Amino acid sequence: MRADIVAGAVFPDYELTDHAGKRRTLSDLQGPDPMILVLSRGGYCPKDLRQAQGLVQLHREMEVGYARLVTISTDNIITTNEYRTGVDAHWPFLSDPGRKVQKDLDIAEYTDPDHNPMIPHVIVLEPGLVIFKIYNGYWFFGRPTIEELRQDLRAVLRKCRPDWDIATPALKADWERGDRGRFYPYGKTYGQVFQEQE
């Protein structure tokens, strides 16, 4: 992994093709929310399939908790769709057969020249693509458990949600004055929030 990809740095805003053939940037997919980014070997790898199956349940929680999940692999668009459908995932999968991310981050898995995948990583991102934590998943047990990711999201949300603890006197006073700027959805309508999630 590139030396500048560390906690506190801003992760590159890659633009890739999603499972539906649409060009997407990571920042657009993230919106104003925390995001878990999975850099995957691809659908051929049983470890990655098992990891994605585990993420299906967490993703249901992330949807109601206003957090995002994205997977990037070096698979082509057909294999990307087979991978996504095969694990019953409902989050965006990005296809990078040109290995833009692999090359830019210097994470070619040189021990597998036949598939030439990325070394698997899971990156927890604060809003603005700010790196909170990086997990190296070359070995399966280097990858975070669902509970570790849940704890990471809790820590990130505590940092980025000004209304994390609405029992504080200052927030109560804001609410009573009609000042809703520090309360979710932070000056937006719910219609705008739901539109951003598409």
Residue ranges and their predicted role:
Residues 1-198:
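Chalcogenol-based redox active-site neighborhoods
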